[in-house]
Structures are given as C-alpha cells and as structure tokens.
Swiss-Prot record:
ATP binds at E337, G362, G363, H364, I365. Pathway: Carbohydrate degradation; glycolysis; pyruvate from D-glyceraldehyde 3-phosphate: step 2/5. Its EC number is 2.7.2.3. The lineage of its organism: Archaea, Methanobacteriati, Methanobacteriota, Stenosarchaea group, Methanomicrobia. This is Phosphoglycerate kinase 2. It comes from Methanosarcina acetivorans (strain ATCC 35395 / DSM 2834 / JCM 12185 / C2A). Substrate binds at D28, M29, N30, R44, H65, Q66, S67, R68, R122, R162.
Length: 416
C-alpha cells in the first residue's frame, strides 16, 4: 500500500498508492453562513481542491464539521457539498449520515473517482470530547467506519489543536498521513519557526495579547526569530510594562479584555529579550476618527485611544522587515477597519512581500492582505487560526502528533 518516500516525520499522499483505495479525508470546511444557510466565505472549501485533485484515482469519503452545538450556523454539510461540486467540476454526493447503515452502504458502493460528503461530524456527541487517540479509536464512529476505508488523511490543520474523534481516532487503526493543506501548513510554519533564512522577523499585533506573548516567548527562547516587532494591543501592553503612561482609556481597554495580568509577563519578556523586542516610538491616536501622531513620550493619562503605530515606527519597522529574509505576520497593527488607522498594517504587509519567505498567520490581517490584493505575493497564508497560534507558540498539536505517531508505526512495521 505504501511507497516509501518521505523524509519528514509524517506521511503524505505521495507515500501511498491510492489508486482504487477508499480514502477517509478529514477536511476543514467550517464556513461563515447567513441566516438562510448560505455560505458567505468559501475559502476553506476551495483550499482542499488540490488535495482532492491528487486523489482522483481513489474513492474519497469526506469528514467535516460546520460550527458547533448551540450556534445558529450549526447545520448540515449539504451546502458545502454543493459548492465543492462546482469547484471540483464533478458531483460530490451529500450523505445524510455519519457511520450508520446509510453511510456504509454509500461507501461500499463507491467507484474510483467518486467523492461523498458525510454529515456534520459534530452532530455525533462524542466527536467534540477531548480524549487520547487510543480512547477515540475505541468509539463507535471509528469502529463502524474504519473497516470500510483503507487510508486516513488529515487535511484539517485548523482543528489540529483539538484531540477530537475525527482528528485523532482513525490514526490509531488506519495507515494515516497528511493531505496537501496540512502538509503545506506544517512545512511552511516549520520553516518560519525553525528553518527560515536569517534574519528572521516576527511582527505580532491584533487584540489577542496572550497569544502574541506566547509566540514571542517561544520564538525568542528557541531562536526561531532574531527579532519580534510588537504592534496593536500587545504593543500597548508592552509599552505599559516598560513604564510608558499609555493613558487611562487605553489601560481601561486592556483591563476590559482581561489582559491586565499580561503586563507583568510582558515586563519579564522585555527584561529577558530587551534588544530583540521592538516597541513603537510613536503612535496614532483616534481623535473623533481623525489620525493624530504622538510620540510615546508625549502620552499621558488623558491620551485618546491608540489606534495604530505612528509614522516614525512605520518607517523603522518596514525598513527592518524589508532587510529580513524571513517574515511572519500575525494580527493587524491597528484598527484597520478605519481607513486612517489601517496605514501601519498596510505598510507592514507591503514590506513583508519583499522578503524571501513570508507568512501570514491568519486572522484579521488576512482580510487586509486580501483588501490590498496581495494574497499571491506571500509564501504562505495560514488558515489555521488557533491551531496556527498554538504551533507558533511551540505547543504540540494533537492532530499533528497523531500523524507523527502513525509515521513511527509505519517505520517500525518496515523493520519487521
């Protein structure tokens, strides 16, 4: 079944002889939907086309989820199958079942080249329980579906940080590897965090302060980055930690988001990595939606909301980014929804595409990249969300670890 080829610590499509085989493919097609059930953004659906094209000689059974219980968009996979049919150029059959007789009958009757979409896996209550791969392998879903398929491929990087049934359970009982989305995410993020050309710069912003500080600590401690440049709310937290009076309104916002406790963590990182963390020299205040440039030494208790990095900081940061070989961006530099305060974000994006290898970590900055029409100028744009952040922060992802374990099993089997 296997064609020995990979030098990585996980298997990919290229390691399998997939002709005529039945492939269970876990994808991530979780998409925003309107109240009528129409998909508003099909990016994640389109992202799996390359994987499916490479599996055309096989029978492909898709496992996916949409939203989660209690949400208004927690619905069936029927609209996803419809859109996927259009993009794939052939029928993707929606099956209103997960592992019952109806689903198994469809799988057993498939011919080479067929693609079916099983029902939302989160309709099954055990799916979202966080358990070990061995425990997940002992569930009804795995026991019922596994005998009908030959190979499991995980292409759902965005849920790789979850130890959910459909993410880790099948790797225990089936030959398992990564689909093209998963493969590209792991190779690209690994290069950004570990093997990128130097100098390597991380530019972190947005409103999720704890995530940015986790990533900062990991990449500076591990040597994955030479420098980290801070923007957005995390920069405000770091400025406060460094002794700058950022103003009551800005401190109140930090407190309202539950990030006051992150000031001490930022202080510790600044003390440990003083010369490797870049902070803004100036900022842009929002005066009734008008941009007002202020040096940080001029900030005081009455200062207006900080909505962007200042012009001097933009020049400093973009010069440093342009002279780097590897650049990883995560989170916008300011309130980019307001045109006057999108300047820092846009200039950083334009500078990043001039580096040899550039990564967008996802989130709101991806929206700004699309707004500028520069998606294809980046080496990689992650669709991982929380999984991407955890990976950049050095966390082990259950979905990835289960693929590594499957690879070890394969290596051990070779020795027998």
């Amino acid at each position: 079944m296997l064609r020995v080829m990979t030098s990585r610590n996980f298997l990919t499509i290229d390691d399998f002889d997939i002709r005529g085989k039945t492939i269970l493919l876990r994808v991530d097609m979780n998409s925003p939907m309107d109240t009528q059930g129409h998909i508003l953004d099909d990016m994640r659906i389109k992202s799996h086309i390359a994987t499916l094209k490479d599996l055309e000689s096989a029978k492909v059974v898709l496992l996916a989820h949409q939203s989660r219980p209690g949400k208004k968009d927690f619905t069936t996979m029927k609209p996803h199958a419809h859109l996927l049919s259009r993009y794939l150029g052939k029928q993707v059959t929606y099956v209103d079942d997960i592992f019952g007789t109806f689903a198994k009958t469809h799988i057993a009757s498939m011919e080479d080249g067929d693609v079916i979409m099983l029902e939302n896996v989160r309709f099954y209550s055990e799916e979202s329980l966080e358990r070990t791969p061995a425990e997940q392998a002992n569930t009804y879903m795995v026991k019922k579906l596994a005998p009908f398929v030959d190979i499991f491929l995980n292409d759902a990087f965005a849920v790789a940080h979850r130890s959910h049934l459909s993410v880790v359970g099948f790797t225990e009982v089936l030959p398992s590897g990564a689909g093209r989305v998963m493969e590209k995410e792991l190779v690209s993020l690994d290069r950004g965090v570990k093997g990128g050309e130097r100098p390597s710069i991380f530019v972190l912003g947005g409103a999720k302060v704890d995530d940015s500080l986790r990533v900062t600590e990991n990449v500076l401690t591990s040597g994955g980055a030479d420098r980290v440049l801070l923007t957005g709310v995390v920069a405000n937290v770091a400025l406060a930690a460094s002794g700058v009076n950022i103003g009551k309104v800005n401190m109140d916002f930090i407190k309202s988001q539950g990030y006051e406790n992150q000031i001490e963590k930022a202080r510790g990182l600044l003390a440990k990595f003083k010369d490797r963390i870049g902070l803004p020299k100036d900022v842009a205040l929002n005066d009734n939606r008008e941009r007002v440039e202020v040096h940080i030494s001029e900030l005081n208790s009455d200062s207006l909301p900080i909505n962007d990095i200042g012009l001097e900081t933009i020049v400093d940061y973009t010069n440093e980014i342009q002279n780097s070989k590897t650049v990883v961006l995560n989170g916008p530099a300011g309130v980019s929804e307001i045109e006057d305060f999108a300047l820092g974000t846009h200039e950083i994006i334009k500078a990043a595409i001039k580096s040899d290898f550039s990564i967008i970590g996802g989130g709101h900055i991806s929206v700004e990249v699309a707004h500028l029409g520069l998606e294809h100028r980046f080496s990689h744009i992650s669709t991982g969300g929380g999984a991407c952040i955890d990976y950049l922060a050095g966390e082990k992802l259950p979905g990835v670890e289960s693929l590594k374990a499957a690879y070890i099993k394969y290596q051990e089997a070779k020795k027998l």
